[in-house]
Amino acid sequence: MSAISLINSGVAWFVAAAVLAFLFSFQKALSGWIAGIGGAVGSLYTAAAGFTVLTGAVGVSGALSLVSYDVQISPLNAIWLITLGLCGLFVSLYNIDWHRHAQVKCNGLQINMLMAAAVCAVIASNLGMFVVMAEVMALCAVFLTSNSKEGKLWFALGRLGTLLLVIACWLLWQRYGTLDLCLLDMRMQQLPLGSDIWLLGVIGFGLLAGIIPLHGWVPQAHANASAPAAALFSTVVMKIGLLGMLTLSLLGGNAPLWWGIALLVLGMITAFVGGLYALMEHNIQRLLAYHTLENIGIILLGLGAGVTGIALEQPALIALGLVGGLYHLLNHSLFKSVLFLGAGSVWFRTGHRDIEKLGGIGKKMPVISIAMLVGLMAMAALPPLNGFAGEWVIYQSFFKLSNSGAFVARLLGPLLAVGLAITGALAVMSVSVVALAICCVIGGVAAPWLLPMLSAAVPLPLEPANTTVSQPMITLLLIACPLLPFIIMAICKGDRLPSRSRGAAWVCGYDHEKSMVITAHGFAMPVKQAFAPVLKLRKWLNPVSLVPGW
C-alpha cells in the first residue's frame, strides 16, 4: 500500500472507532474495546505511512478520500506520524483495561478524534487547515480533562493561541496570496517571512507546545486527566505545537540569526525551569508534566540549533541540530508514555498519585516498577537508553555552534551545552507499559542505525565521525554500561559477611518516627533552597492570575 492509502485507512479507523465508541458508551467495557482496537489499528496504519515515506526519503502528496482534504507527507512530518502512531498504539491498547475501573468514564470518542485531528494536522498541505485541525485536536484534549476549572484554563489559553494563529494566517494571505505550504516556501525565497508573522506563530504554537512562560495549562491539565489522556497530551498534542513552530521557521530557508537564538533561549529556559519546578511536586502526573516541559525545551534546543545553522549557513550544525531534536522528540514520546501509563497503573491499583505514599510499590507491582525504572533512566539520559542518544546528538550541535565564526554563536554554544547538562496492573496495561520500555532500550542500543534514517528528514548529510570503532562495537559498549557495576561487584567482593542481626535504627535514644524517614521532598530541599528566587516567580509573575495558577 502507498503512504496515502495507509494514511487514509488510519484516519478512517480513528473516525470509525470514535463514532462506534460513542454509540456504545452505555456499555463501558464494550466501548473501551471498540475504542482501543480501532485506535490501535489506526495508529499502526499511521506509523506505517510515516515509516514508508521516511525510508523512501521522498515526499508524497494526495488527498483524503473521506473529505476533500489535500495532504502532503514529507520525510520531516513522517517522523511525527511515526511518533503519533507508536504512542497511539500502546495508549489505545492500555485504554481497554483502563475502562474497567469504576471511576473511569468512557473516553473513546475524544481520544480517537484527537488522534484523527492530530494526524490531519501533521499531513496538512495548507497552513490554514493545519491550524483548524490543531484546534479540533486541542478541543478534544480539553474535554479529556476531568476538572472543569482546569478545562476552562486550557480552553482560554488555547483560544488565545488560536486567535494569534488566525491573525498570522490572515497576514500571510495578505502578503503572499496563499496558505499552501509549498507555494509559501517558494515565494518566501524571494520575499522572506516577516518577523511579525513569525512571532505571532511562535507564540500561538508555543501555547500549544507549552513552552515557558506559555505553559499555564500544562501541569493542571496533566494532573487532572486520566493516564491515557495525559500520555497523549505530552506525546501528541504538545508535539503538534513544536511542528508548527518548526514549519514556520523553515519556510523559505532564509531564517535570520535571531530566530534561531530566540528558539535556543526559549528552549533553555523551558528545560531548566521545567526541571526545577518538577522538584516541588508530589502528584506524580503533575511532576511528569513538568518533566515534559523540560524535554520540550531540550527538543526545542535541537530545533533551534538547526535554525541557527540555517542562518549561519553551516550544514553540519543544521543536520546535527535537527536530527538530534527530531530523535529526542521520538524518544521522549516513548519514555514519557511509559511513565504516564505506569503512573496510571499505580493509581489503578492503589488509588494514590502522591509519590510520598507509594513507598514499597515495587513489591506489589514488580513488572510495572521495572518498566517505569527503564523509563526514568531514559528520561535521565543514561546509556544505553534512547534518551541518551538524542541528547548526545544535541550536545554535538552545541559543540559545532561554539566553533562558529559568529561571536554570539561562540558565546552561546558552551553555555547551552552546560545548561543542558544540569537539566536533568492489569494484563493489557502491563503489556503496553513493558513494550514501551523495550522500545526505549531499542531506541538507545540501535541508535547508530536509527539516526541515519532520521537524517532523510534533513536535506543535508550528517558528517561521518572520524573513528575506527564500528557501529556494532558502539552498541556492545552501550549494552555493557549498565552491566559494568555488577561485573566489578562480582569480581571485587570479598568473603561473605557474617550474619547480621536486624533491629531499630539508633536515633539518639528517641523512638523512631515516620517523620525521620528521608523523603523525596527532603532529598530535593537543598536544590529548592538554592533556587528559591526562581521558584517564587510562579507567584510573582503569574500571567494567568485571573484563572487557576500554575
Predicted regions and their residues:
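Hydrophobic alpha-helical transmembrane segments
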Residues: V71-G85, L193-F205, V408-G424, N466-P485
